[in-house]
Regions:
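Transition-metal
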Residues: 212-389, 455-498, 523-525
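Short acidic-glycine-tyrosine-enriched beta hairpin
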Residues: 410-423, 555-580
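Glycine-rich phosphate-binding P-loop
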Residues: 40-58
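Double-stranded beta-helix
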Residues: 176, 379-406, 439-484, 587-607
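Ligand-binding loop in jelly-roll beta-barrel domains
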Residues: 335-341, 349, 372-375, 428-447, ...
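ATP-dependent small-molecule kinase phosphotransfer cores
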Residues: 2-21, 66-137
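NTP-dependent small-molecule kinase module
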Residues: 1-35, 52-65, 165, 172-177, ...
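ATP-dependent NMP and nucleoside kinases share a basic, alpha-helical "lid"
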Residues: 124-180
């Protein structure tokens, strides 16, 4: 939980509970409603649920002896479902030979504006103002109703926000229908369309609203039983205070067939969880940030915070380069005491991702080994003697004829030890082997372009054969990344590097573990006994992970009260604007901290 210092005014402005929020909201507009009428607009992030709040508003309005009317902006302004399908479906891959699970598609870039029916909008812009009258409240609701083309007709503007986890859970419960749909489709289809259209529209809409400070009221809809409401200025102040501190995001945990038990035990996860294969500690599009505000605990969508405080958080150059998105993602892959390896896989490069998915660029990753058991291995690159055409034939046979592939003949590996760092630029064949926990650090993509090339003929939890992406894998895998090449300091494919000292001070040393011109991140390790001094210089954020030791405090030099205490295997972000900061050992063991930042010259990095 993050505990920035907030003013009493900010704390008192937060209203908790839908009934109390409705009562307070109506009190702020009652006089205007009596005198001339009020048009209220309620927009929100994908799956936002404003139904209960609107019903409570209607009750409060009736108690005051006023009239009310509700208008669904999506039904009133969007093209019909068939027209929207005709726009979005061609962007999605429907060939199961290419994409067996129908995961992929192209990002729709038209926004809510591109889905509008111009004739309907013309009528809407006349009928909504015409409905306004003294003694009446008109409530307009719908995704995208606050876009520039519509917003000037409203008097009061609201935005319902929620965490990505909450949004995904609502989708999986069948509570959401894609834009233009009357009812929910199959869950996987709803999710794919959200990734390539609905989420994308919502994120860009919210980003523009934040930039121009459009909303009057901000709502947190993550807990249906505890709606939280505050003036948008209050939300902005909370973000402005939080970015002055080192902070941690709220993790998400996912099970997987190759998942292990280490993180489940370390973090006291529920016994009914089979495992925790993936721990999304700091994946920007998936996490939220918990903020303590008086007695209230606010669970804020991380991207909402990023888009409000982007420059202070990431630095101006980073905001420009990555269009306001946080450009690095962090998660744990846990195969400790598991049933097997992660799949043999690769990811696609920039040209492929841009042309086929409308993405930002390539999907790079890296692995840092933190915990190992017996015989743990990290697979990376092809062996020098690998017959790659033969490998392709074997994985094809595994996929179509269910014949096992002798992958050890083809794929190179490192003996895993704590502290091993490998870089995985797009196209590198790789896998995290059984019996280890790795810190995975990757580049910015909206989707996840993981092409499983071999998965040991393994069944998923549903008892079905896990799908293989041999076609996409063969198109993208880099055949030149072989054992000798990836270890050669003279090679541009030098991605298994030896640590080299980069900086030192009183009792501390900083090593570069991995830097390569093909990747825009710099992977480092801080080593010290007592304390270590660092400086963001107001230019780059730092992401710190305690990979050895008990507990440390990360604090500002100029403002020591601005600090965060992090435990073993926690991940903390130090905002670019912090400047000089100190990491202090609060335990007795020597400290090792993994540090990630943007590589010098990242501004000129190609896609």
């Amino acid at each position: 939980v993050n505990r920035p210092e907030l003013s009493e005014k900010t704390i008192q402005a937060i209203c908790s509970g839908a009934p109390a929020a409705a009562k307070k909201f109506i009190a702020t507009i009652a006089e205007q409603a009596k005198r001339e009428g009020v048009i209220v607009a309620i927009d929100g992030y994908t799956t936002a649920n404003w139904t209960v709040f609107i019903n409570l508003l209607a009750r409060e309005i009736t108690i005051l002896g006023l009239e009310w009317e509700t208008i669904d902006s999506n039904k009133s302004t969007l093209k019909d479902g068939k027209e929207i399908d005709a726009m979005i479906d061609p962007l999605l891959i429907w060939d199961t030979k290419i994409d067996p699970t129908l995961l992929y598609g192209k990002i729709y870039k038209g926004g809510y504006k591109g889905l509008l029916d111009e004739e309907k909008v013309g009528i809407f812009r006349k009928t909504v103002p015409a409905a306004k009258a003294p003694g009446k409240v008109v409530i307009v609701y719908g995704y995208g109703c606050l876009i520039p083309e519509l917003r000037d007709i409203y008097d009061v503007k609201c935005f319902f926000d929620l965490t990505p986890k909450t949004s995904m859970l609502r989708i999986r419960r069948g509570e959401y229908s894609n834009l233009g749909k009357e009812r929910p489709d199959a869950i996987n289809r709803v999710i794919r369309r959200c990734y390539y259209c609905d989420f994308e529209n919502a994120v860009h809409n919210r980003k523009e609203l934040w930039k121009n400070n459009v909303p009057d009221w901000y709502f947190i809809d993550s807990d249906p039983g505890k709606l939280q409401m505050m003036p948008f200025a209050t939300f902005a102040d909370i973000c402005a205070q939080l970015v002055k501190y080192p902070f941690r995001t709220k993790p998400c945990y996912l099970e997987g067939v190759w998942g292990g038990t280490y993180m489940k035990k370390l973090r006291n996860l529920p016994k009914e969880m089979r495992n925790a294969a993936w721990v999304f500690d700091f994946i920007p599009m998936e996490v939220s940030v918990l903020v303590k505000a008086g007695e209230e605990l606010l669970d804020i969508n991380y991207c909402s915070f990023v888009h409000k405080e982007g420059v202070n958080l990431m630095g101006e150059d980073c905001v420009k380069k990555y269009q306001g998105y946080f450009p690095i993602r962090f998660n744990w892959d846990d195969s400790y005491h598991s049933t097997g390896n992660m799949s043999i896989q690769c990811h696609s490069g920039g040209k492929f991702n841009i042309e086929n998915y409308n993405e930002f660029g390539r999907q790079d990753e890296s692995y840092y080994v933190v915990v190992t058991g017996h015989e743990a291995k990290t697979f990376i690159g092809f062996r020098d003697d690998a017959d790659i055409p033969a490998f392709f034939k074997e994985i094809e046979a595994a996929d179509t004829e269910h014949k096992p592939c002798d992958y050890m003949k083809y794929v190179s590996y490192e003996e895993s030890v704590p502290g091993l760092q490998v870089m995985l630029p797009a196209g590198t064949i790789h896998s995290s082997g059984r019996n280890q926990v790795i810190l995975e650090i990757g580049s910015l993509t909206i989707g996840s372009y993981t092409y499983k090339m071999y998965d040991y003929l393994r069944l998923d939890f549903d008892g079905k054969q896990r799908p293989i992406h041999t076609h996409l894998g063969e198109l993208n895998v880099r055949q030149d990344r072989r054992t000798s090449v990836i270890h050669d300091p003279q090679s541009p494919e030098y991605i298994v590097q030896k640590p080299r000292l980069d900086a030192s001070g009183d009792g501390w040393e900083e090593y570069i573990l991995g830097e390569n011109p093909q990747m825009y991140i710099s992977l480092r390790r801080l080593e010290f006994e007592n304390r270590c001094e660092q400086d963001t210089k107001g230019e780059k954020f730092h992401v710190l992970t305690l990979v050895d030791g008990e507990k440390v405090r990360v604090r500002s030099v100029e403002h020591p009260e601005r600090h965060f205490d992090m435990d073993f295997m926690e991940i903390v972000c130090v905002p670019a604007d912090m400047g000089r900061y100190v990491i202090e050992n609060l335990g007795k063991e020597p400290i090792r901290i993994h540090k990630t930042c943007l590589r010098d010259g990242y501004q000129n990095d190609p896609a």
